Amino acid sequence: MERKEFKAESKRLLEMMVNSIYSQKEIFLRELISNASDAIDKIYYRALSDDSITFNKDDYFIKVTANKEDRTLTVSDTGIGMTKEELESNLGTIAKSGSLAFKTENESKDGHDIIGQFGVGFYSAFMVADKVTVTTKALGEESGYQWESTGADGYTILPIAKESVGTEIRLKLKENSEDESYDEFLEEYRLTSIIKKYSDFIRYPIKMDVTKRELKEGTEDEYEDVIEEQTINSMVPIWRKNKNELKDEDYTNFYHEKRYGFDQPLKHIHISVDGAVRYNAILFIPENIPFDYYTKEFEKGLELYSNGVLIMEKCPDLLPDYYSFVKGMVDSEDLSLNISREMLQHDRQLKLIAKNIKNKITSHLKTLLKDEREKFEQFYRSFGRQLKYGVYSDFGANKEDLQDLLLFYSSTEKKMVTLDEYVSRMKEDQPYIYYATGESYARIEKLPQTEMVADKGYEILYFTEDVDEFAIKMLASYKEKEFRSVSSGDLGFEDDEQKDTAADTDEQKELFEHMKTILDGKVKDVRASKRLKSHPVCLTAEGEVSIEMEKVLRAMPDNQNVQAEKVLEINVNHDVFDVLKASFESDKDKVDLYTKLLYNQALLIEGLPVEDPVAFSNDICKVMA
């Protein structure tokens, strides 16, 4: 018996492949099953051009057998088998792929696809086995051969008698160590789990002898273990079925089988693309926010399959962050994988798929908004924040795609509205899209700054989430209409009463300068208000940072004490202003007291903390005394 050396190359190369290429030892079973599937595919291809070969799919299968006594695990198939030369070529040369060569010769025949593209998957068996024995008989050959190896020291090939065509790979599992237990790969439940996880959609039956507990014949309460051969895999993936054949409950069952969520899917998206890149996908929008969605433990990503074989449980590159809530899977024949079939060799195809998926999700959400408004609003309550982050992130690169999906509460409609609906109702003389920010709709409605805009009959959008104003600042405008906060210095309109107010402000310049001095460092300016009607005072902001944005930024762990440029506005038509004027002429100490009170009052209205609550309390007591 002649021992032969591996053609490519040494113990170090094999050790690198076994120890470095694969991240999880369980992958070996996926690789051996994929190779077995390829072997059956090759008979199918041969039958296409050879009338003497009849391909009846029911005759072909893969069998996985565990023997605890011998500590062996066997994967056998009824595929095409290998000749002695093919054993030498495919198994005697590390990183030589018979499947890849076969695929190249038989490109795109009748939709069947060879899974294995590298000659490395077989060698993953050495991650769990001390010895690997391959017995095989090729189609059309009279005798079979046995290939055997214990690793990098080489291999032997012997002729053997074998009746049936096909290949059997028997692994002699390693002994357990302190760090690793190889017994798990002899356990029925573990093998079943691995097959379902990675190879559930292999197109041929994967069979196993399964132990069942049954009532012993002739008894009423005595049970016995019965061995029954079962097909473990589903074989036909739902995503390759015609959409017209599937019902909503089929998608819901798939959602639960894959454990994408414990809730019901709000929407499913079934995609089949055959263009620049070919892929199938089934995506789900969950009904509820996952419990860990806003934690660092949450991982975005879709399951990624290559020809029905799972290669990545969560591929993050398939989804943009703002669609991270989407669950589901993608299967493609066009992926360029690395030799371990666990990672992508380069990402051109993946980028094309990801771009297409992003566009499909956006399109389906727009359709949902148009045709099923109630369901869309349910979705928006859960994931609207993510869409706003999408508008704001990446310097607004995605704002054009997402702006028509945004909803905000309307002051006039008393419900959520789109930006398009708002603009369609704008009055002819209305210069801006107005918005107000606050912690709740009820608080916003009471803001002094909303009075003038509301009295003009203009609709106001209410922003109650911390990301709202950041997203709108990034949008800047919608359909050539700029966004304008009701707290901004210029509201875009001025009536006669406001012009008179401006004149009054000029007359009282000395008073406002004095108040500004008292509030030195706290406000940029004190001025007469053009927006207040019934309220005596309010705070507004100038510049890019609004008061609401200041609150958000200051709440962040790494805040840099960002502050809005605040302006204290005084209603010169209010009785309080008359008191201020009179005090300025007779008792400036009272002006100081009133100024501080008005400033703190304005802070409270905005939901900002009073800087010195004790001093504020004392000032109130002074007024009451």
Curated annotation (Swiss-Prot):
CDD domains: HATPase_Hsp90-like (cd16927). It comes from the Bacteria. Pfam families: HATPase_c_3, HSP90. InterPro entries: HATPase_C_sf, Heat_shock_protein_90_CS, HSP90_C, Hsp90_fam, Hsp90_N, Ribosomal_Su5_D2-typ_SF. The keyword ATP-binding applies. One of its GO terms (cellular component) is cytoplasm. Its main location: cytoplasm. Residues 1-341 are annotated as: A. Residues 552-625 are annotated as: C. It is found in: Cytoplasm. Residues 342-551 are annotated as: B. Keywords: ATP-binding, Chaperone, Cytoplasm, Nucleotide-binding, Stress response. One of its GO terms (molecular function) is unfolded protein binding. The keyword Chaperone applies. PANTHER family: HEAT SHOCK PROTEIN 90 FAMILY MEMBER. Belongs to the heat shock protein 90 family. Homodimer. NCBIfam families: PRK05218.1. Molecular chaperone. Has ATPase activity. This is Chaperone protein HtpG. It comes from Halalkalibacterium halodurans (strain ATCC BAA-125 / DSM 18197 / FERM 7344 / JCM 9153 / C-125). The gene is htpG.
